[in-house]
Amino acid sequence: MNTRIEHIHKLGVDIGRVIISPVKDGKSDTAFLSGGIEQALQTPPAEGAIERLTRLVEVFEGRVWLVSKAGKNTQHKTRLWLAHHRFFERTGMSAHHLRFCFKRHEKAGHCVELGLTHFVDDRLDVLRHLQGLAPHLYLFGEQLKSQSAPDWVEPTLNWDETFTAICRSLD
């Protein structure tokens, strides 16, 4: 009898400031949150996000979910942005793998329900809620200099670093 248990890897990814770029033309871009729908749609994807997520969808055999904290208005803008940029078609990710919550700590419930093993977020306060739930946590993007990453997260500055770190964890 084979008693070996295969561990199925599953990835969760935040949207704002991770997939949707926080910077436009070298400046902080707040148009997605504070502007109208047309401005939000013009916000580009983060550099390398589409390409690297396309590969991660393949590596994780489709077990990739978007998990975002957003109010009703931002949820609507996010859905429109994903459609406008043909996100699901371009990455191969299932459009049914989109989850929203109203409070940051609620991402933990999605993490448990989906059995996520890896999670990428730009906020340390979110990742604190996932500590002990997903074994591989990635703090994405530039952080405040006064905020050093604890040893239970892996800081990654961009999608190239994130992709490399995630793939390394699968070896």
Indicate where each model-derived feature is located.
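Active-site neighborhood of HAD-like aspartate-dependent phosphohydrolases
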Residues: 1-47, 51-58
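Short acidic, S/G/P-rich loop/turn micro-motifs used as interaction or catalytic elements
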Residues: 19-20, 72-73, 126
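Short, flexible active-site-adjacent loop segments at beta-strand->alpha-helix junctions, enriched
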Residues: 23-25, 70, 104, 143
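Acidic-and-aromatic substrate-binding clefts and catalytic sites of carbohydrate-active enzymes
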Residues: 41-45, 72-74, 102
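Substrate-recognition element of Asp-dependent hydrolases with the DxDx(T/V) motif
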Residues: 49-82
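C-terminal cap/substrate-recognition subdomain and adjoining C-terminal extension
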Residues: 75-171
